[in-house]
């Protein structure tokens, strides 16, 4: 592969070379996740070939392990000795914690007070020190930055970092290895590290691949920034897609997204829940809200058919770290809707 004129615009931030280097760097740590075809989404919904990239089966249950391990691998011995710190709603936290454990590095993770219990416990289980601070990610991040400065620790940013983006971009290389003629790729978006990395990998190979970012209607800072062509804050309420609850995207990720992503789709909380239910019932996949965003976009009918019908489509299931109480609530809600529908129809 060679970098083309499209990706040259963002090569100073993250390049195909960075991603290929990341692939070699993290190979001993990560799992190459499967890509499976969804017969229901293919035959019943899109009339195309829809594949699910299962990053919920990655170590730590999320794609975040890729970026975290690549970043930490590139730290100096002095930085590793002083310890690392990160701010995360949970998935990045686990990626940092596990990598730190494997490399024998002290790790501190600051999480929002609303972080799911499952993600808190998993992070602690990998040996990291967990501090709960802040009602949203931005408050958490500010506190984390204070601690880092006070203690001389190196920050492992969850998305706005070249090495993190490159690590996430290895997913794009795996997609191309499995489906070289992919037409459309649908990616969940929070701070933008995942879609920036994947878009760089894919567009370096074929600029005509259509890349769609998906965010929740309640929190969509990147989509707002994309269409206003300037960094913009947006958060109306919390979202079941807590892994993407980032109201202000990264400066670096935004620059990549601005040039390489083609469009954004916004989905409601109900549409996200429906997608989680559908993935459980039809594909036997348990996913967190963020991981269901691409499927929600497909099921919602908001994506133009020309990007789906007769096309090879990949929808990324980015993670599966969800509390069982949340899963049971989603199932119960779905059953209640079904019962109500039966009552109306019957």
Swiss-Prot record:
Known regulation of activity: Each protein molecule can bind up to four molecules of AMP, which act as an allosteric activator to the enzyme.
InterPro entries: Ser/Thr_Dehydratase (IPR050147), Ser/Thr_deHydtase_PyrdxlP-BS (IPR000634), Thr_deHydtase_catblc (IPR005789), TrpB-like_PALP (IPR001926), TrpB-like_PALP_sf (IPR036052)
GO terms of biological process kind: isoleucine biosynthetic process; L-serine catabolic process; L-threonine catabolic process to propionate
Binding residues for AMP: 59-60, 94, 125-126, 321
Gene3D superfamilies tied to this protein: 3.40.50.1100
The entry's keywords: Allosteric enzyme, Lyase, Nucleotide-binding, Pyridoxal phosphate
Keyword set includes Transmembrane: no
Reaction(s) the record says it catalyses: L-threonine = 2-oxobutanoate + NH4(+)
Metabolic or biological pathway, per its Swiss-Prot or TrEMBL entry: Amino-acid degradation; L-threonine degradation via propanoate pathway; propanoate from L-threonine: step 1/4
Signal sequence bounds: none
Cofactor: pyridoxal 5'-phosphate
CDD domains registered for this protein in UniProt: Thr-dehyd
MF-aspect GO terms: L-serine ammonia-lyase activity; nucleotide binding; pyridoxal phosphate binding; threonine deaminase activity
UniProt key word Transport: no
Protein EC: 4.3.1.19
Quaternary structure (record): In the native structure, TdcB is in a dimeric form, whereas in the TdcB-AMP complex, it exists in a tetrameric form (dimer of dimers).
Name under which the protein is recorded: L-threonine dehydratase catabolic TdcB
Gene name for this UniProt entry: tdcB
């Amino acid at each position: 592969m060679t970098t083309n004129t499209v990706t040259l615009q963002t090569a100073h931030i993250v390049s195909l070379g960075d991603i290929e280097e990341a692939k070699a760097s993290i190979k001993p740590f990560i799992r190459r996740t499967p890509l499976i075809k969804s017969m229901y989404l293919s035959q019943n919904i899109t009339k195309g070939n829809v594949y699910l990239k299962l990053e919920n089966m990655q170590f730590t249950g999320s794609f975040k392990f890729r970026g975290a391990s690549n970043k930490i691998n590139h730290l100096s011995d002095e930085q590793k000795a002083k310890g690392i710190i990160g701010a995360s709603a949970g998935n990045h936290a686990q990626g940092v914690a596990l990598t730190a454990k494997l490399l024998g590095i002290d790790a501190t993770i600051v999480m929002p007070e609303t972080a799911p219990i499952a993600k808190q416990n998993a992070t602690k289980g990998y040996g990291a020190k967990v501090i709960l601070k802040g009602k949203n990610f931005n408050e958490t991040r500010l506190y984390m930055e204070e601690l880092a400065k006070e203690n001389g620790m190196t920050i492992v940013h969850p998305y706005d970092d070249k090495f993190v983006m490159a690590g996430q971009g290895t997913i794009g290389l795996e997609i191309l290895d499995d489906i070289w003629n992919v037409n459309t790729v649908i990616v969940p978006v929070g701070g933008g590290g995942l879609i920036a990395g994947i878009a760089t990998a894919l567009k370096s190979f074929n600029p005509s691949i259509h890349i769609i970012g998906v965010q929740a209607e309640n929190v969509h800072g990147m989509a707002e920034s994309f269409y206003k062509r300037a960094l913009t804050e947006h958060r109306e309420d919390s979202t079941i897609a807590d892994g993407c609850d980032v109201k202000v995207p990264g400066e670096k990720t935004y620059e990549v997204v601005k040039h390489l992503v083609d469009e954004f789709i916004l989905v409601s909380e109900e549409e996200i829940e429906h997608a989680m239910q559908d993935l459980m019932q039809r594909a036997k996949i348990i996913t967190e809200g963020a991981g269901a965003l691409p499927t929600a976009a497909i099921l919602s009918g908001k994506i133009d058919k020309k990007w789906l019908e007769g096309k090879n489509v990949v929808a990324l299931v980015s993670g599966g770290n969800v509390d069982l109480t949340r899963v049971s609530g989603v199932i119960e809600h779905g059953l209640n809707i079904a019962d109500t529908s039966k009552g109306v129809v019957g």
